[in-house]
């Protein structure tokens, strides 16, 4: 696989159609990749079958195509990556960096859900956790938010890598796949900012490279909640991408007058790449004017 100086990605979970918040992350990561002269790819994070919606991943890919956001590399599906995750787990178990655990959430409730030592005997249902030693501060420089520091031992505890029901945990799958694909830059929503330190610990344990990180501000609904399917965020309209693209451009802090009001999707994206400025990206999550504008255009 080639090793570009910049390879970004958009990695949706197939729990429903893409919405405006999804577009902000996809468009933002795509623009940053194009601005850097790099590549951008799509990965379907379908490791949680109980939450997956039938046909959702295909619809998500159709939406990205309608919005002109094409993956430069073949689309990867995490549901087809069991062998890679198993190999990573076995390696960590063999080196003592991971261990089996039968502690349930109820068992850990008295510790605030944070696992520092097993309190339940091993049973038939066993998770696998990354062993996090005491005093495990992890710091990194986010390209938008600056220095971020977290004591993973105190704040998170031993990290689940494989759930007791046998499904892979997000933290393991994302680290293994970012490394396998050669992802150099992770651009995603700020709701995943506090997941980054535990992913960095896992990267160190596996001996894989650490990407650069940039966490975009979240788009909030009228009640101040993150736009999401669970909170009723409407699906993007594949038949009319321009209003949502204009609104997402504004949500990324860019100058609205830089893009033509009437254009093909291809022309609009060409102009977006030409005029995009990372220095204008906002840092604060908010009920953004872009969200309001997009909703007005839909009404």
From Swiss-Prot:
Enzyme class: ligase
Keyword check for Metal-binding: yes
E.C. designation(s): 6.1.1.-
BP-aspect Gene Ontology terms: glutamyl-tRNA aminoacylation; tRNA modification
InterPro entries: Glu-Q_tRNA(Asp)_Synthase, Glu/Gln-tRNA-synth, Glu/Gln-tRNA-synth_Ib_cat-dom, GluQ/Sye, Rossmann-like_a/b/a_fold
A GO cellular component annotation in the UniProt record: cytosol
Record region (Disordered): 279-299
GO molecular function: ATP binding; glutamate-tRNA ligase activity; zinc ion binding
SUPFAM superfamilies in alphabetical order: Nucleotidylyl transferase (SSF52374)
Residues that bind Zn(2+): 101, 103, 118
Basic and acidic residues: compositionally biased ranges: 285-299
Short sequence motif named 'KMSKS' region, residue ranges: 226-230
Cofactor note: Binds 1 zinc ion per subunit.
Cofactor section: Zn(2+)
Extent of motif 'HIGH' region: 12-22
Binding of L-glutamate, residues: 9-13, 45, 170, 188
Keyword Zinc part of the UniProt annotation: yes
Binding site for ATP: 229
Keywords, comma-separated and alphabetical: Aminoacyl-tRNA synthetase, ATP-binding, Ligase, Metal-binding, Nucleotide-binding, Zinc
Family recorded in the similarity comment: Belongs to the class-I aminoacyl-tRNA synthetase family. GluQ subfamily.
Function: Catalyzes the tRNA-independent activation of glutamate in presence of ATP and the subsequent transfer of glutamate onto a tRNA(Asp). Glutamate is transferred on the 2-amino-5-(4,5-dihydroxy-2-cyclopenten-1-yl) moiety of the queuosine in the wobble position of the QUC anticodon.
Protein name per its UniProtKB record: Glutamyl-Q tRNA(Asp) synthetase
């Amino acid at each position: 696989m080639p090793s570009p100086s910049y390879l970004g990605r958009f990695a949706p979970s197939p729990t429903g159609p893409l919405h405006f918040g999804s577009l902000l992350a996809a468009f933002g990561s795509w623009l940053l990749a194009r601005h850097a002269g790099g590549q951008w790819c799509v990965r379907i994070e379908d490791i949680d079958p109980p939450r997956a919606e039938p046909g959702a991943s295909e619809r998500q890919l159709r939406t990205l195509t309608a919005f002109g956001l094409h993956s430069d590399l073949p689309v990867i599906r995490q549901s087809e990556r069991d062998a890679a995750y198993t190999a990573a787990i076995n390696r960590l178990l063999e080196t003592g960096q991971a261990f089996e655990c039968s502690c349930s959430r109820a068992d850990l409730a008295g510790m605030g859900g944070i696992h520092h030592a097993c309190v339940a005997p091993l049973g038939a249902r066993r998770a696998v956790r990354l062993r996090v030693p005491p005093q495990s501060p992890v710091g990194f420089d986010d390209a938008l938010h600056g220095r971020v520091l977290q004591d993973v031992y105190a704040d998170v505890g031993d990290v689940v890598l494989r759930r007791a029901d046998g499904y892979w945990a997000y933290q393991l799958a994302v680290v293994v796949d970012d490394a396998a694909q050669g992802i150099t830059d992770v651009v995603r929503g700020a709701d995943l900012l506090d997941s980054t330190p535990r992913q960095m610990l896992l990267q160190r344990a596996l001996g894989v490279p650490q990407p650069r990180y940039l966490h975009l501000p979240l788009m909030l609904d009228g009640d101040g909640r993150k736009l999401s399917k669970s909170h009723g965020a409407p699906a993007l309209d594949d038949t009319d991408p321009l209003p949502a693209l204009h609104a997402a451009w504004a949500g990324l802090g860019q100058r609205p007058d830089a893009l033509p009001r009437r254009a093909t999707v291809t022309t609009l994206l060409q102009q977006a790449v030409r005029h995009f400025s990372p220095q204008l990206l906002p840092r604060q999550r908010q009920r953004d004017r872009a969200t309001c504008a997009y909703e007005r255009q839909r009404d």
